[in-house]
C-alpha cells in the first residue's frame, strides 16, 4: 500500500519562474482520443449534469462530453443526430445483457460512436473486461473509456483488455455515499489514488470525483490526469437539467448521485444522495472562468501549455490549505 495518502486540499503546487507576459498566452487545450479539446475537463455523465442540449453545446464549442446512460432507448438516435450534425458522439453503456445487443445494433445501423464509456461503480470486474472486448470486436474504431477503478492493478487489467482510457475514482463525489455505505473507495485520498494509478497507466486517465475548486483541476493534471470529470461544480447552471426551485429564499437546482433512489426510482442498493446546489448562472461563463483559472495555473507552473503543470513541485500540507476559509 501507499506510504503517504493525501487529497486535493492537502496539496499545494509550487510556482516556477513565469515565461509568459500574460496568462492569456497559456494554452489549456488537451489531446484525447485523437482529438483536441479546449479544456482537460468533462462534465460528469450524470442525469442532473448533462442532457442532449448541453452535450450539443459542448461538442459545438470544442469541449469533450460524455452523455449519461439513464435513458438507454434514446442513445441510438443521439449518436445518429450528433454525427449528422458533424459533431462527435460520446455515450455511456453499462454491462447488462441488453447493452451487448445495443452495441451490435449500433454496428448494424452503421453507427460508430467516437467515444464509448463503460461506466459502472466497481469497474475492476470481469463484466467490464468482457464489455471492453465486445466493443473492441464489434466497433473497433470507437475509443473506449472504462471505469470506475481505484487501483493500479485495475488500470493495468482494463488497459490490457483493450480500454483506451480508464476512469479513476470510487466514491469521492459530493453526492456519492459509497464511502459511508460500504467502507470502500477513494474518498478522502482521491488525489493520491490518482497518482498511484497514473504511475501504472500507459494510456490516459480520467480523474473522476472530489473536485471542489478550479485549482483541483490543475492538481489532477499534476498527478497524471489527462481529463478531469466534474459533477457538483457543473450542477446548478441555467442550462442544467431540472427545474429551478426556491429554498430558504435561494434559487437552487437539484443534484443527485447516479446510484441514488432519485436516479433509480427505487430504494435498492442506494449509494447516492440528493442535494440542492445554489444557482450558478450560465454554463459558458463557468467554462470561461475554468479556462482562465487554468491559464493562470499554467503561468504559475512556468510554462505556456498544460503539460507544464505535470512537472511542478508540490508540498503536502496536512492542516488543509483553506485554514478555515470555506470555499465549498
Curated annotation (Swiss-Prot):
Top-rank lineage group of the source organism: Bacteria
UniProt xrefs under SUPFAM superfamilies: Inosine monophosphate dehydrogenase (IMPDH)
Broad EC category: oxidoreductase
Pfam family, one: IMPDH
MF GO annotations: GMP reductase activity
Record keyword NAD present: no
Active site: 176 (thioimidate intermediate)
InterPro entries: Aldolase_TIM, GMP_reductase, GuaC_type_2, IMP_DH/GMP_Rdtase_CS, IMP_DH_GMPRt
Taxonomic source organism: Exiguobacterium sibiricum (strain DSM 17290 / CCUG 55495 / CIP 109462 / JCM 13490 / 255-15)
Gene: guaC
Keyword entries, A-Z: NADP, Oxidoreductase
EC number: 1.7.1.7
Family: Belongs to the IMPDH/GMPR family. GuaC type 2 subfamily.
Disulfide feature: none
GO cellular component terms, A-Z: cytosol; GMP reductase complex
Binding site for NADP(+): 205-228
CDD domains named in the record: IMPDH
Gene3D superfamilies: Aldolase class I
Keyword NADP (UniProt): yes
GO biological process: purine nucleotide metabolic process
The protein, known as: GMP reductase
Catalyzed chemical reaction(s): IMP + NH4(+) + NADP(+) = GMP + NADPH + 2 H(+)
Task performed by this protein: Catalyzes the irreversible NADPH-dependent deamination of GMP to IMP. It functions in the conversion of nucleobase, nucleoside and nucleotide derivatives of G to A nucleotides, and in maintaining the intracellular balance of A and G nucleotides.
Amino acid at each position: 500500500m501507499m506510504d503517504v495518502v493525501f487529497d486535493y486540499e492537502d496539496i499545494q503546487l509550487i510556482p516556477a519562474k513565469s515565461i509568459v507576459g500574460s496568462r492569456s498566452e497559456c494554452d489549456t487545450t488537451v489531446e484525447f482520443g485523437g482529438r483536441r479539446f479546449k479544456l482537460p475537463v468533462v462534465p460528469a455523465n450524470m442525469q442532473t449534469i448533462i442532457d442532449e442540449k448541453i452535450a450539443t453545446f459542448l461538442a459545438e464549442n470544442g469541449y469533450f462530453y460524455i452523455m449519461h446512460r439513464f435513458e438507454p432507448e434514446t442513445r441510438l438516435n443521439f449518436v445518429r443526430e450528433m454525427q449528422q450534425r458533424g459533431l462527435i458522439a460520446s455515450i455511456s453503456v453499462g454491462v447488462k445483457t441488453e447493452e451487448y445487443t445495443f452495441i451490435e445494433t449500433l454496428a448494424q445501423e452503421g453507427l460508430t460512436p467516437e467515444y464509448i464509456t463503460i461506466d459502472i461503480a466497481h469497474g475492476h470486474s470481469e463484466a467490464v473486461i468482457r464489455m471492453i472486448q465486445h466493443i473492441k470486436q464489434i466497433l473497433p474504431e470507437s475509443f473506449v473509456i472504462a471505469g470506475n477503478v481505484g487501483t493500479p492493478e485495475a488500470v493495468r487489467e482494463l488497459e490490457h483488455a483493450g480500454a483506451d482510457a480508464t476512469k479513476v475514482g470510487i466514491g469521492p463525489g459530493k453526492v456519492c455515499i459509497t464511502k459511508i455505505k460500504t467502507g470502500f473507495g477513494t474518498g478522502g485520498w482521491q488525489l493520491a489514488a490518482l497518482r498511484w494509478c497514473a504511475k501504472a497507466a500507459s494510456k490516459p486517465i480520467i480523474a473522476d470525483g472530489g473536485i471542489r475548486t478550479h485549482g483541483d483541476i490543475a492538481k489532477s493534471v499534476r498527478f497524471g490526469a489527462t481529463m478531469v470529470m466534474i459533477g457538483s461544480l457543473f450542477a446548478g447552471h441555467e442550462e442544467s437539467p431540472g427545474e429551478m426551485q426556491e429554498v430558504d429564499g435561494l434559487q437552487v437546482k437539484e443534484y443527485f448521485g447516479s446510484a441514488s433512489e432519485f436516479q433509480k426510482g427505487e430504494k435498492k442498493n442506494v449509494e447516492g444522495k440528493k442535494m440542492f446546489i445554489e444557482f450558478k448562472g450560465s454554463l459558458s461563463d463557468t467554462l470561461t472562468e475554468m479556462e482562465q483559472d487554468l491559464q493562470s495555473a499554467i503561468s504559475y507552473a512556468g510554462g505556456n501549455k498544460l503539460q507544464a503543470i505535470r512537472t511542478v513541485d508540490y508540498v503536502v500540507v496536512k492542516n488543509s490549505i483553506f485554514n478555515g476559509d470555506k470555499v465549498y
